[in-house]
Swiss-Prot record:
HAMAP family: DnaA_bact. This is Chromosomal replication initiator protein DnaA. The gene is dnaA. It is found in: Cytoplasm. Residues 73-109 are annotated as: Domain II. Belongs to the DnaA family. Keywords: ATP-binding, Cytoplasm, DNA replication, DNA-binding, Lipid-binding, Nucleotide-binding. SMART domains: AAA, Bac_DnaA_C. Residues 327-448 are annotated as: Domain IV, binds dsDNA. It comes from Clostridium novyi (strain NT). InterPro entries: AAA+_ATPase, Chromosome_initiator_DnaA, Chromosome_initiator_DnaA-like, Chromosome_initiator_DnaA_CS, DnaA_C, DnaA_dom, DnaA_N_dom, DnaA_N_sf. Its main location: cytoplasm. The keyword Cytoplasm applies. One of its GO terms (biological process) is DNA replication initiation.
Length: 448
């Protein structure tokens, strides 16, 4: 940026600042960087496509008029997206099997620069998974191999996988680190078969130091993909190369996954991530506000954390939605404004808040039992069968892991939960009276 443009932009900001609320200015204008200027046009760089759209529709004329006040000339304004954002967007586009980013002439993955260990918020719900990921990053193929991370959508699995990749590349720049989704792995395999490039495909995934595969559950039911990944896994494992996998469920719960793969996924360490607790949700919101340079009142963060409980993605999305709503309505951020901005999300979120405790209460009332009896070690049919029904419903209606469900039923093992789920599922196939009971309980739980 030349001195003339820098001086002009500083004066322009001073004019615009007097026309907007502080929130609108900080959200939309402050992030703009002037990059070039010629006789008729000034080019401005913005952080993302969403911001560009808002600036084009709402603030472009304001910027043009502010510059005209200073220069007495009407310049054309062009917005472009920062090179980092373009790079990130390219990561999301499908690529051919030969379309790789090369660092030091070695094949590597494309990792999101925002997903590092430093930007990961640690809480009780993810502390173990974070520690395991860091251990693997510090000592690839020596600490835990494979590392299997599982948890619900938007809880930070992908963040940890990218963080592992970043850490390894920072400390060993020449390492071959490949990150890929299981869907892309499958698509590349199909293309390699179609184009008769099987050997090229195998070389790509078997000659690496670290392989990170996201959403591995999607290879279930795909026989050829499972066959290929089985041999890829073996080749890497035998060569002492690190394998990191993520899934929305533990290996035991992935349906139609071959037993030989299931057993290999369990060779190393399995770490789960749960939904963040209240304190962690507050910490996540504060971190997001700091990163985005947002001034959010503490009581608004408490409101968001109280209402949005399911995952990190929805938490951060709620924060951005409130800021955008404040800017578009020209109002200061407050709890009342937050309630307006999030009314649709909160309604949906509240509908999803089915807990194991709620299921236990309703099942106990239905069968005239006490909670202590449901959690006890007693195995009489009048207690054991309702307990199995409650476990079945907990598995169907919540995102809790099998170990967590077992823990809520008197500290039982996850295999007990599996047995209960399978038993009730089998009876439901032939027993209409039980189907009616389950339907009735379902209605009571979801309408509660």
């Amino acid at each position: 940026m030349n001195a003339q443009l820098k001086q002009l932009w500083t004066k322009t900001l001073n004019i615009i600042k007097g026309e907007l609320t502080e929130v609108s200015f900080n959200t939309w204008i402050k992030s703009i960087s002037p990059i070039s200027m010629n006789e008729n046009t000034i080019k401005l760089e913005v952080p993302n496509d969403f911001t560009r759209g808002i600036l084009e529709s709402r603030y472009k004329d304001l910027i043009i008029n502010a510059i005209k006040l200073i220069t007495s000339k009407k310049y054309n304004i062009e917005f472009s997206i920062t090179s980092e954002e373009i790079f990130n967007n390219q990561q999301l586009k499908p690529k051919s099997s030969n379309d790789n980013i090369v660092v030091n002439d070695e094949m590597t993955s494309i990792l999101n620069p925002k997903y590092t260990f430093d930007s990961f918020v640690i809480g009780n719900s993810n502390r173990f998974a974070h520690a395991a990921s860091l251990a693997v990053a510090e000592s690839p193929a020596k600490a835990y191999n494979p590392l299997f991370i599982y948890g619900g959508v938007g809880l930070g699995k992908t963040h940890l996988m990218h963080a592992i990749g970043h850490y390894i590349l920072q400390n060993t720049p020449n390492a071959k680190v490949v990150y890929v989704s299981s869907e892309k792995f499958t698509n590349e395999l199909i293309n390699s078969i179609k184009d008769d490039k099987n050997e090229e495909f195998r070389n790509k995934y078997r000659n690496v130091d670290v392989l990170l595969i996201d959403d591995i559950q999607f290879i279930a039911g795909k026989e050829r993909t499972q066959e290929e990944f089985f041999h890829t896994f073996n080749a890497l494992y035998e060569a002492d190369k690190q394998i990191i996998l993520s899934s929305d469920r533990p290996p035991k719960e992935i349906p139609t996954l071959e037993d030989r793969l299931r057993s290999r996924f369990e060779w190393g360490l399995i770490a789960d991530i749960q939904a963040p607790d209240f304190e962690t949700r507050i910490a996540i919101l504060k971190k997001k506000a700091d990163v985005e340079n947002l001034d959010i009142p503490n009581e608004v963060m408490v409101y968001i954390a109280t209402k949005i409980k399911s995952n990190i993605r929805e938490l951060e999305g709620a924060l951005i939605r409130i800021v955008a709503y404040s800017s578009l309505t020209n109002r200061e951020i407050s709890v009342d404004l937050a309630a307006e901005a999030l009314k649709d999300i909160i309604s949906s979120e509240q509908n999803k808040q089915i807990t194991i405790e709620l299921i236990q209460d309703i099942v106990c009332n239905y069968f005239n039992l006490k909670i202590q009896e449901l959690k006890s070690s007693r195995r009489t049919r009048n207690i054991a069968f309702p307990r199995q029904i409650a476990m079945y419903l907990s598995r169907k209606l919540t995102d809790m892991s099998l170990p967590k469900i077992g823990e809520e039923f008197g500290g039982r093992d996850h295999t007990t939960v599996i047995h209960a789920y399978e038993k009730i599922s089998n009876i439901l196939k032939k027993d209409e009276s039980l189907r009616n009971v389950i339907d009735d309980l379902n209605k009571k739980i979801t309408n509660n």
